[in-house]
Amino acid sequence: MKFSLKLNRSVFCGILFFAAIPSFAQNEHAKAANGKQFIVDSEIPWQDLGGGLKRKIMSYDPTMMMVKIDFQKGGIGTPHKHVHTQMSYVESGIFEVTIGDKKQTLKKGDGYYIPSNIMHGAVCLEAGVLIDMFTPMREDFVK
C-alpha cells in the first residue's frame, strides 16, 4: 500500500504557523515578565524582609518564579500556606523545615517539595540560603 500526501503552499504554511504557536507563546512569557533569561546574581538587589531574612527575586514569568532567600542564624520563615506549588534547594546553611505535620533538618545540597495549600515554614539553625521555585509565579512578591 502506497500513501502519498500532497500539500499546496498555503496549507503547508498554515501547518507551520500553527506548529510554531507554542514557541511564540513561550517567547511572549519571557517578554511579559522581568525579562531575565540570564540571571546575574550581583545585578539583583536584596530586599530586607526583617527578622534576619532578605530576598532576591531572581527571575519569573507568569508560570514560574525563582527566589533566593538569605537567612541569618535564628531567622524564621513563619508558617504559612499559599496556592503555589513550591520546590526549594538548600544552597548553604542548615534549616529545620516543617511541611504539614512533618519536620526535617536539611543542609547544603538538600531540598524539599511543598504541594499547593499545605502549611509550611523553616527555622534557620546555621546561617544560609534557600533557592525557592514557585509555580505559578508569586504575584504578591512583585507588587
Residue ranges and their predicted role:
Residues 1-12:
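Bacterial N-terminal signal peptides that target proteins for export
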Residues 11-22:
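Bacterial N-terminal signal peptides
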Residues 24-63, 143:
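A short, N-terminal "cap"/entry segment at the start of jelly-roll beta-barrel domains
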Residues 65-81:
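Conserved short histidine dyad/triad with adjacent acidic residue
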Residues 83-95, 100:
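Glycine- and acidic-residue-biased ligand/ion/polar-headgroup-sensing regions
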Residues 91, 107, 126:
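A cytosolic small-molecule/anion-sensing beta-strand core signal
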Residues 102-116:
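Short acidic-glycine-tyrosine-enriched beta hairpin
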Residues 116-140:
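Ligand-binding loop in jelly-roll beta-barrel domains
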